[in-house]
Amino acid sequence: MIENIKKRRKKIKKLLKRKRRQKRINYINNLSITKFMSQIDDKLFLKIFKDNRRGYFKSFMKLMSRLGDGYVWAFLYFSLYMFRIKYAILYFARAAAAVFICIFVFLYIKSFFSRMRPYKKHDKIPIMYPPDKHSFPSGHTMVGFAISFSVGSYSFGSAILFYTIASLIAFSRVYVGLHYPLDVICGIVLGSVIGMLTNMAFYYMIGLPIVGHI
């Protein structure tokens, strides 16, 4: 009897939570500025994305989008270690800290805004692989630019390498139809800010330079 009451209470709490969340989403979506930005964002997205594209560039963009899952960053870290770059482990630790912060931040923001993916609005967009539900902001882009700011600050050469890859991943997320341009732009800003703050934190904690190397 008591267990049934507890189960009912849990169900009621979940239902109320869903209703509050839906009410918040509806409020945000009905704001004039939100509607205006969504219209511009949607038009820009449709110009970038075209479902009839074929060829090597589209295949390359698909590859870059998948590399954003973490494979390319792991390879680059391994390369840093193999080339015996001084304090590679510290730079790895700093980047890892930035990544964990990014994951926490973008999961919270995605849950708060609950913006639909482009494929849910446009029927002609094929799903390349099952992504998570929400679009805003782009988690891949956030992580890419946080890592680039963290590790790319080691030298000018590493900055060019990391930022080039991060930019390609960011563009590919729109090109293959997984994100709107605004998702990616906000991901760039948030990722860069998190990367900068992480660099500053490691500087004050252990003296690892914000820009450059020891």
How does the language model describe each region?
Residues 2, 6-132, 142-169:
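Hydrophobic alpha-helical bundle signature of multipass membrane enzymes
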